[in-house]
């Protein structure tokens, strides 16, 4: 994998040239390689040896808490300590100001070692959304703690009755008229320092990493509708708003208050893939964990009412590239396993002019023409998908740091290529395996 990444980064995408830009001026190939070396080592030590463990030991829910293998916690802590959660962020918030191109390449090592053991892309995407659309205090309290690994994040869109049809979202959010749970009781709901405060009720399905004990807190980003003056929900997507709903309530310094929010795990979904990560059904506001004696999950509005979907698309587009990379690395992991097996498995005799010579030792199956064909097909699908995803990452850097005309062109290209970066590897890297 390393030689392939080096070729794509330096010979094709010219990642070194990014250091000529002001944002990346402190970087060089030396620093890029140091990041790749570190990630390769952590993936080799903390991820790869436990890939089978997290596949056969699914998360377990006993009705009260979720249990995960210790290897998952160890990998989470090692990843957080590496600084990769905030690698692309500004120096002043603890980031490395690393180009997204290099960031994506470095994360490939974790995905190929064990995609199942981590869902850090959700925490990063969650925090990135808040850095763009959140208030200064929301960034400080929630996003920065996600970048450090102290908190983790989710995105809660789908619902049991609606699937992925967001226009049919039925989760409700009403202003929290009760005394503030984060202040001295005198702050009106719409003046809470963490954002306008609402109470949410509803159910969210297929939420990855929706419940675990890997981090101190879980920051749920939840799509919900605020009822109109008549008490009815606005039909379609126009009425959808976005809310921060922490598993545990916090104060304005990000400290846990000791109050559990009214978010309850109803059950875990069993999956064919990504089995080391919880996939959950979450109940918001059912009253299992009442706050201030009342049912309803406390949530803080992000952005403007009715504009939640536009905010969430910031995270969804980023997640699409991440999911595409995950599928890509599953395909490449399969290829590397196939290649290793083909190099070591003897089968059949060499064929000469007179046919097979039974006196000769068996040959490795990689020497069979049809096996070569299949291996080359796997390699083409996997490395082609990797090139596509890294090209999209390079476009992200161009959009953010390029000249105006180049940045606009990169934005347009991303609009076209981002859905492909998710869908093509998801189909053809499965075909490769």
Question: Can you name each region flagged by the protein language model?
Answer:
Residues 11-20, 72-83, 100-103, 196-200, ...:
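Active-site-adjacent bridging/hinge elements
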Residues 59, 122-123, 134-188, 196, ...:
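Internal maturation/activation junctions in enzymes
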Residues 317-402:
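Extended amphipathic alpha-helical segments enriched in small hydrophobics
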Residues 20-32, 56-61, 84-92, 107-113, ...:
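Glycine- and acidic
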Residues 1-117, 137, 141, 182-184, ...:
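Amphipathic, small/basic residue-rich leader segments at the start of a protein or domain
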Residues 414-433:
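Charged, glycine-rich active-site and insertion segments that engage polyanionic ligands
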Residues 195-260:
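A short core secondary-structure module
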Residues 249-266, 271, 278-319, 339-366:
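A glycine-rich, basic-preceded beta-loop-alpha segment at the flavin cofactor/substrate interface
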